[in-house]
UniProtKB/Swiss-Prot annotation:
Species per Swiss-Prot/TrEMBL record: Streptococcus thermophilus (strain CNRZ 1066)
Listed name of the protein: Queuine tRNA-ribosyltransferase
PANTHER family to which the protein is assigned, alphabetical: QUEUINE TRNA-RIBOSYLTRANSFERASE
NCBIfam families: Q_tRNA_tgt, tgt_general
Record pathway: tRNA modification; tRNA-queuosine biosynthesis
The family this protein is said to belong to: Belongs to the queuine tRNA-ribosyltransferase family.
Segments for region (RNA binding): 251-257, 275-279
Organism domain of life: Bacteria
Keyword match Transferase: yes
This protein's encoding gene: tgt
């Protein structure tokens, strides 16, 4: 029996919800949960240094297998000593399988039992990604937490298609487990799919739990369904997953969605949302989103969020940040990106305290009254 390199420790359950306070132990340190993970697609969180990420309390970041496989190449990163050394990050790293990018970015993809053939979005060359190749690339990257190769069907795909898809994803997960070269220092998570169909989510969960992964991801959400539909899927999916393993909701970063996921027992989240909207001057604040590029802030000498104690809000005004963005100065994007990332990482710290205090539902109500509720569940 393998001693898993990724371990989950439950510290406390919230009294009135399914929320749980815990920690995840990895070969590169321990981080508290629930946790939001900043996304470093190309082995960097856009415009942020590792030191800045550590300052804001991010104990784990995500890197993207598809992008790093294409450029600079996983074998080059292995020669550098792995992703941690390559990017000078000494805490935990999670890598996705590359599957989502194949389906969302690549052109002319063809899915078969063996894997996916597609056109490289950088140069148009023909590529092939299989469950075994996805694991091999991640083994070379050396991340602490890896993802099984899966298909991510659209939420409103027909039942028969989704059923075939989850059955293939289960077979791919089994193949990935067999191909995994480093089970003692890299933890491989299975990914539960099934769109909005309860019986298919149950079938997918049963298949993957029987394979005894060290953790489980919930995929196929935040892909066009409403907020209520996502909550409903979590309501019937999370209870199917083991209590002694981490639960990761993939691609979710809207603050209200994070809180609703925690209430249902989810531990980990990631999303490009905070840095993507920051590049357009959109900032998350205690009172909802604020587009600091708007003319209304040209002479506003208050912080982006007066209730925030991040580096940006302690040192700079809305007027100054607006000026930087209007002048296309990179420092402006650095400041808005830092603020948004800090906002979500700090939100999770406040959520953890609410679990300790057994008042998470009250916290949610107070937060949403000020921030707003994103019923469409759009990440953009």
């Amino acid at each position: 029996m393998i001693d898993f390199p990724i371990k989950y420790r439950l510290i406390k359950k919230e009294k009135y919800t399914g929320a749980r306070l815990g920690e995840i132990i990895t070969p590169h340190g321990t981080f508290p949960t629930p946790m939001f993970m900043p996304v470093g697609t190309q082995a960097t969180v856009k415009t942020q240094s590792p030191e800045e990420l550590q300052q804001m309390g991010s104990g784990i970041i995500l890197a993207n297998t598809y992008h790093l496989w294409l450029r600079p190449g996983d074998e080059l990163i292995a020669k550098a000593g792995g992703l941690h050394k390559f990017m000078n990050w000494d805490q935990a790293i999670l890598t996705d399988s590359g599957g989502f990018q194949v389906y969302s970015l690549a052109e002319k993809r063809d899915i078969s039992e063996e894997g996916v053939t597609f056109k490289n979005h950088l140069n148009g060359s023909k590529m092939f990604l299989s469950p075994e190749k996805a694991i091999s690339v991640q083994n070379n990257l050396g991340s602490d937490i890896m993802m099984s190769f899966d298909e991510c069907p659209q939420f409103y795909q027909p039942y028969d298609y989704v059923k075939k898809s989850i059955e293939r994803t289960s077979r791919w997960a089994e193949r990935g487990l067999k191909a995994h070269r480093r089970p003692h220092d890299q933890g491989l998570f299975g990914i539960v799919q099934g769109a909005g169909f309860e019986d298919l989510r149950r079938q997918s969960s049963h298949d993957l739990v029987s394979m005894d992964f060290p953790g489980y991801s919930i995929g196929g959400l935040a892909v066009g369904e409403t907020h209520e539909e996502m909550n409903a899927v979590l309501d019937f999916t999370v209870p199917l997953l083991p209590e002694n393993k981490p639960r990761y909701l993939m691609g979710v970063g809207a603050p209200d969605s994070l809180i609703d996921g925690v209430i249902r027992g989810v531990d980990m989240y990631d999303c490009v949302l905070p840095t993507r909207i920051a590049r357009n001057g959109t900032c998350m604040t205690s009172n909802g989103r604020l587009v600091v590029k708007n003319a209304a802030y040209a002479e506003d000498f208050s912080p982006i969020d007066p209730e925030c104690d991040c580096y940006t809000c302690k040192n700079y005004t809305r007027a100054y940040v607006r000026h930087l963005l209007k002048a296309d100065e990179t420092f402006g994007i650095r400041l808005t990106s830092y603020h948004n990332l800090y906002f979500l990482v700090n939100l999770m710290a406040r959520v953890r305290q609410a679990i300790v205090d057994d008042n998470l539902l009250e916290f949610r109500q107070d937060f949403i009254e000020k921030y707003g509720y994103n019923a469409s569940n759009r990440n953009f």
